[in-house]
Amino acid sequence: MKSVLIVYNQANNERVEYMLDELGIRGFTQWENVQGRGHINGDPHRGTHTWPEMNSAVLTIVDDDKVENLLRMVHKLDKRNSEVGIRAFVWNIEQMR
């Protein structure tokens, strides 16, 4: 099993949920109003007058065989509009109870 953290501009909220539904990924935890800045060339997302945009984040636990398709869809969404931004991070899950 893998843990996938997807961090994205709030403009992509509906697209990310649609992506999870399309892949049959039912369970997730979502955080709104996530602040941050991309590691290469991303602008800050702070919810302030200067930097008004905000991010959201979704954490889901999936079977190994769903990870590649999920990452492929995230990449496709990022290529669609790289200015908006979306990234996915994957970790191994040792145990789940």
Where are these regions (language model features)?
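Positively charged, small/polar-rich N-terminal and surface patches that mediate targeting and assembly
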Residues: M1-R97
